[in-house]
Amino acid sequence: MKEWRRNILGRELVVQYGKVAKQSSGSALVRFGDTVVLATANISDKAVEGIDFVPLTVEFQERFYAAGKIPGGFIKREGKPSESAILSARLIDRPIRPLFPKKLRNEVQVIVTVLSVDPNVPPDVVGIFAASLALNVSKIPFEGIVAGIRVGYRDGQFIALPSEEDIEKGLMDITVAGTKDAVTMVEGEAKEVTEEDMVKALRFAHSVIKELVDFQEEILSEFNVEKIPVVEPTPPEGLVEAFKDLLNKEELERRILVKVKKEREVALKEYEEQLLNQIAEKLSVTDLEGIKPFVSELYEDAVKKTMRRLIVEKGIRADGRKPTEIRPISCEVGLFPRTHGSALFTRGETQSLGIVTLGAPMDVQIIDTLLEEGVKRFMLHYNFPPFCTGEVKPLRGPSRREIGHGHLAERALKNMLPPEEEFPYTIRVVSEILESNGSSSMATVCSGSLALMDAGVPIKKHVAGIAMGLILEEDAEIILTDIIGMEDHYGDMDFKVAGTRDGITAFQMDCKVSGVSDELLMKALMQAREARMYILDRMYETISAPRPHLSKYAPIIKVTKVDPEKVADVIGPGGRVIKKIIKDFDVKVEIDDETGLVKVVGSSEENVDKAIELIREIAKEIEVGEVLEGKVTRIEPYGLFIEVRPGKIGLLHQSKVGEDMRQFLKKVKVGDTIKVQVINIDDLGRLQFKRVTEGENTQHGKTHSKRN
């Protein structure tokens, strides 16, 4: 067993190797502060046939024992990965995936298991460090060292590993990963920060990343691991030369420049089939399937180089646009009669339908994860059905990609929402991607913002998003605005920026190259800002402010406050009082025991108002001398029990009935209404009444009765 230690950011970072998981090809047990993770890396013996990508899987296992908790619910063990675990797995996957050899076809599985968790040291950040180490000490081909860090921004200072208070009171929460040379991955949210501050944050993060990578280099200097060779199949003799001879570059250009996505795909596929047949004929090959993978690989490379060359040399993109040009945009709101808010945002061949549903406070999402307990009142769900790209696939639950895209759009919008005190509704936004050709997550931000205003949610400002790309050649750096799927696939960087007219609210970046300079990143962010302003103008033209009224189909929520000491009276013995209010007025009621805040939800404003009025009445202090009307609930030989408010029952003793006591007691029955005056409240809160007859002056009652 080997162990290495280094103090970083005022915490001890400890790495152990050879103590646990020794049968794994690579493993690392890493402790940073009180967070401990185990990362393992393994590879299959055989390559997977018929694929053209690295078959990498990253799993992030949350173990509740790491936080000293037992899982909630009926089943007391961890089940399928939670949404937070999936997001953490994606966060680890993104910086390590580009570092595998492009021709690797053996299955690789990286598993990060959280064994102990410190709230101020995110396990996913430690997981990036541990996964990098596990891969580098394994026999798996892996070409680099990466690390990650979480960064906050508060009171003008950047903070590495910020506390929850720093995040809540600060302006930024981003996770950054990279190599010793450059930042390669960013994911996070902000409260309208400037582009300059974002670049400074990445520079600050990279200074910490370099120290983390340096520590890994120190550890890895003690290892001399022989990596598995990546076996590349050799194409048949003469195939590469035949492909070069038969490829017509002008014809390929023409097909790449077909403006419509589906037509372009068909045109390119047809030309690939044509080349395959021509090569087979030239080489006298009868087994087309045998040479097809080699031809496909050569063709893919030719398409990539040609698309990039057209942009660099001629400034023309596949759909005919210039590098800074945005596709045509259209916005519509109020599409459906019964939804609470709706919007259709279309940018070229990417289209998002945003739907807003307003719910009661009790409709919140209950959160019970490794690091979080509580509720979530704003949710954004992103759906990417197969028809949006004209494909046929089985419909199952949300994919990791759908969860990740929805999370990014949610982070872009959430800081523009009104506080719960001003708008007590639970808010759900659903984005249905109806067409997709690049940047559907940023289209989701736009449709979500439009739909929120259409629903009458008092958001502070519109939020728009744009996806940017980069073509990096030895003699050129071309930044692309509003990339399509093809440019995302063949480009060197994909970064998405969302924000208002005043600043950035969400940012995501993935770099396929070794990294980009601060100057280039700043240029790209400013180009993205121009695009964002253009999109925001189109959105404000469609709907410039939240609608003044909510949909008539949205639930009605009204809020009142009672003395916390009176909450028990409102609830009543065994919940009898509150249950009766709920039943009588067809409402839902939520009461905060500590603050006395009462939320009443219903479909009828009249009923909600009546319920609120009754709750206030119940919570109102009953005073000695007060005259009330109540119903007889019980008759005893010594007097009557009268309920003057729900749950508030007192005694009208026979001696307090008045001169016609006997005649009155003979006639009275349960359910009769009687006017009484409170003459005493004892130490236990029990009420004593006297009967008030018609025309009786009761003002004197307050002066010579007292509350004991």
Curated annotation (Swiss-Prot):
PANTHER family listed in its UniProt record: POLYRIBONUCLEOTIDE NUCLEOTIDYLTRANSFERASE, POLYRIBONUCLEOTIDE NUCLEOTIDYLTRANSFERASE 1, MITOCHONDRIAL
Biological process terms in GO annotation: mRNA catabolic process; RNA catabolic process; RNA processing
Catalytic reactions of this protein: RNA(n+1) + phosphate = RNA(n) + a ribonucleoside 5'-diphosphate
Ranges where the S1 motif domain occurs: 625-692
Family in the record: Belongs to the polyribonucleotide nucleotidyltransferase family.
Keyword flag S-adenosyl-L-methionine: no
Keywords: Cytoplasm, Magnesium, Metal-binding, Nucleotidyltransferase, RNA-binding, Transferase
Protein name stated in the entry: Polyribonucleotide nucleotidyltransferase
InterPro entries per UniProt: ExoRNase_PH_dom1, ExoRNase_PH_dom2, ExoRNase_PH_dom2_sf, KH_dom, KH_dom_type_1, KH_dom_type_1_sf, NA-bd_OB-fold, PNPase
Ranges for domain KH: 555-615
Coiled coil regions, renumbered to chain: none
Binding site for Mg(2+): 488, 494
PROSITE patterns documented for this protein: KH_TYPE_1 (PS50084), S1 (PS50126)
Record EC number: 2.7.7.8
GO cellular component: cytosol
Function (record text): Involved in mRNA degradation. Catalyzes the phosphorolysis of single-stranded polyribonucleotides processively in the 3'- to 5'-direction.
Compartments, as annotated in UniProt: Cytoplasm
GO-annotated molecular function: 3'-5'-RNA exonuclease activity; magnesium ion binding; polyribonucleotide nucleotidyltransferase activity; RNA binding
Domain of life: Bacteria
Named cofactor requirement(s): Mg(2+)
